[in-house]
Design a protein with these regions (language model features):
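Beta/alpha (TIM)-barrel catalytic core signal, keyed to glycine-rich beta->alpha loops juxtaposed to Asp/Glu
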Residues: 1-145
């Protein structure tokens, strides 16, 4: 398993392809985007809307598919071959998300439209974390070298 941040706005297409080629299952966290940042650090969220759920394209795809924006994001991740792990504290939202496992299927065009939302910026970046004083120094951020 490889657990990575994965929403229509933030996903690593090359990593998904590499995992698929090697038979590694991708588990995608934050399928709705990292909207918690906007609540505490609105000036440092790199996207125009804090949550993918607020994006007009996501809303349009959801309306076409007869589902909620959250369900569209989960269905998108599943269409990409990932196992999304959305979070919600609301029991009804959890049930609604579970219903989409069988009830929501996106067309190839809808998946492509959500793919087009991809932005190279991550939801949580070392510079943001350091500036917002979540961590003391960018030296604590993971460095793959």
């Amino acid at each position: 398993l490889n657990e990575v941040e994965m929403s229509p706005r933030c996903y690593q297409a090359e990593l998904l392809a590499a995992c698929e080629a090697r038979g590694v299952r991708v588990v995608g966290y934050s399928p709705y985007g990292t909207c918690w940042l906007a609540k505490y650090f609105p000036d440092f969220v790199p996207w125009p809307a804090a949550s993918v759920l607020d994006d007009a394209t996501v809303a349009a795809v959801a309306a076409e598919a007869g589902c909620t924006p959250a369900q569209a994001c989960v269905a998108w991740a599943m269409a990409k071959g990932a196992s999304p792990i959305p979070k919600s504290l609301d029991p009804e939202r959890v049930r609604a998300t579970a219903r989409c496992l069988d009830d929501v299927a996106l067309t190839a065009d809808q998946v492509a439209r959500l793919d087009a939302l991809r932005d190279p910026r991550r939801g949580v970046e070392a510079s943001l974390a350091a500036h917002a004083r979540i961590i003391a120094s960018p030296d604590y951020a993971w460095d793959p070298t």
